[in-house]
Amino acid sequence: MTKPRKRGEAIRGFISENVENDPSKVIARTMEKFNISRQAVHQHIRHLVGQGALIHRGYGSYELRQQEEWDETISIADNPHEDVVWRNLIEPRIGKLPDNALHIWYYGLTEMFNNVVDHSESKTVSIRIKKTAYTTEMIIADYGVGIFNKIRNAMNLLDERHAVLELTKGKLTTDPKGHTGEGVFFTSRMFDTFYILSGEVFLSHTYDQEEDWILQVRENCNGTWISMKLRNNTSRTTKEIFDEFTSGDEFGFTKTVVPVRLAQYGNERLVSRSQAKRLLERIDRFKTVLFDFTEVKTIGQAFADEVFRVFANEHPQITIIPIRANVEVTQMISRARSGIEDRQGLLFDPKGQN
């Protein structure tokens, strides 16, 4: 592909992205981003309109054309096999995409649909697909017990927020004989945006952001709603995501990132050993653990000691890496680690560059 053609595709990709996210400023932003004239931007817009990717809605107003919009509720009893659902219902609606994007969609759909079949106790599942020239979005909704409620009851946890903390660690399943507990974790990392709404909890992950977001919603959502969205021309691959959470020469899911703030409730401080033990549950299943201290302003001595001295001494085979810690948290971690750091060779990167 020649350089002018690459640049033209980059410009049109930028226009498509901004038409979807903020159409009112697409022309000005494109001019600034690529240092081109207004006339040049309009030329690229006309190209996209001619391709059928954009619709002209009036003076200076454009929107992405829907290439596919499909919504269907199906019986789980009549459709128990995720690969058959993919082949007969989903792949024809998603249509032509690069192989790497199709592989991501296959993984996401089959993992999430299988979770509905095996765990939700729902009789039906609704699937919605919306595809434009730029992105494809899929929503999978069931009407069962709810994913966070299921985890809370199966593991005897405090509440649904505690269930979210466990889910974000990975390797979590309520059926260890039939599942690895990796599906939701890896699916959430593969897509541009991924969210789960269930009960009173909204969990969201965006690809280029390390941390997960969790919100308390006012109205209780029955069952579970899952949304997955991906750019059609993504360069991402499933292998790339799997490799990101594999430590060194190891094979398998051996590395995880734990958002420490999910162990907090409201404005409480992380000060106690019981809070630390809650954070450390199932961490011994990994070989490398990154504790992300984003939005954690301070931690107590007992909390730090339990994580960075007691647990570290008991599990010398696990590499513990705190990231994105502020000065106060860093100092407390250093105090807890004093005397054991040289012996265990634990890594420490408060800025998250490891």
Describe each PLM feature range.
Residues 303-314:
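Short, non-transmembrane amphipathic alpha-helical segments
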Residues 1-110, 119-124, 235-280, 319-354:
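Bergerat-fold GHKL ATPase/HATPase_c domain
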Residues 186, 278, 306-307:
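A short acidic, amphipathic alpha-helical/loop segment
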Residues 55, 60-71, 116-239, 312:
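Conserved beta-strand-loop-beta-strand hairpin that lines the nucleotide-binding pocket
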Residues 284-299:
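Short, glycine-/small-residue-enriched flexible loop/hinge segments at domain edges that mediate gating
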Residues 220-221, 282-285:
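A structural signal for short secondary-structure junctions
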Residues 22-23, 284-287, 316:
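Flexible coil/turn residues that form the inter-helical turn or adjacent wing/linker of helix-turn-helix
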Residues 206-207, 300-305, 331-333:
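A short acidic (Asp/Glu
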